[in-house]
Amino acid sequence: QDVRVQVLPEVRGQLGGTVELPCHLLPPVPGLHISLVTWQRPDAPANHQNVAAFHPKMGPSFPSPKPGSERLSFVSAKQSTGQDTEAELQDATLALHGLTVEDEGNYTCEFVTLPKGTVRGMTWLRV
């Protein structure tokens, strides 16, 4: 069974406000392993393209200085806390706080999975 990424084509936010960029991997597939979730800005300068990542064991990271870790958070993704707990990465919704004009643009949510490979969806954030 094929999996797909469900995103909204456009999300609108207010300057200074908080916006959520929904991203879900559907449908739930038994035995599907998500090895990494990333959010990228394909139109940004090279060192600002990787906005956020969530690893099943290492948890979240926010490599780009813009928007940066102080303005980003994963809404419901959870990392594995031990051998008996599975990471919960099907919902990779990203919250962006303190919106600025520079935040406007395309955001790509990408799931790296085994055995299905990489699947992605793109959202336009309008501020």
Where would I find each of the regions flagged by the language model?
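Proline/serine/threonine-rich low-complexity linkers at boundaries of modular beta-sandwich domains
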Residues: Q1-V3
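Extracellular beta-strand/loop-rich beta-sandwich domains predominantly from IgSF
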Residues: L8-R12, F54-E104, T113-P115
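Solvent-exposed, conformationally flexible loop/turn segments
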Residues: Q14-G16
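Structural signature of extracellular immunoglobulin-like
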Residues: V19-P28, S35-A44, A95-G98, D103-L114, ...
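N-terminal V-set
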Residues: P27-F74
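A structural signal for beta-strand boundary/capping segments at domain termini and interdomain linkers
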Residues: T118-R120
